């Protein structure tokens, strides 16, 4: 019964963490752009929570291998992916 709320809370937490990456000027622009795209996917209410999470995970996994990514940003992205992997319909 409380599953939809839990999913939305997880998505909201992921968006907050991604927003920190977007606002961090020490993170390369392409990585901040990918984080912005992931946020946009997570906020698309036309899709189910699991689909939104899967779309964002795809974007974040692609960018997480970037050799120019600072370590703190990579760890944050891994944390976001871990949160989003628990979102189920």
UniProtKB/Swiss-Prot annotation:
It comes from the Archaea. Gene3D superfamilies: Ta0600-like (1.20.1440.50). InterPro entries: Ta0600-like_sf, UPF0147. NCBIfam families: PRK04330.1. Belongs to the UPF0147 family. This is UPF0147 protein SSO6503. It comes from Saccharolobus solfataricus (strain ATCC 35092 / DSM 1617 / JCM 11322 / P2) (Sulfolobus solfataricus). The lineage of its organism: Archaea, Thermoproteota, Thermoprotei, Sulfolobales, Sulfolobaceae.
């Amino acid at each position: 019964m409380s599953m939809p709320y839990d999913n939305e809370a997880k998505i909201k937490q992921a968006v907050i963490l991604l927003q920190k990456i977007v606002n961090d000027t020490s993170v390369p622009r392409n990585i901040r752009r990918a984080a912005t795209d992931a946020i946009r996917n997570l906020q698309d209410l036309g899709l189910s929570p699991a689909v939104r999470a899967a779309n964002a995970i795809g974007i974040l996994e692609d960018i997480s291998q970037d050799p120019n990514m600072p370590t703190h940003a990579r760890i944050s992205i891994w944390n976001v992916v871990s949160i989003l992997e628990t979102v189920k319909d």
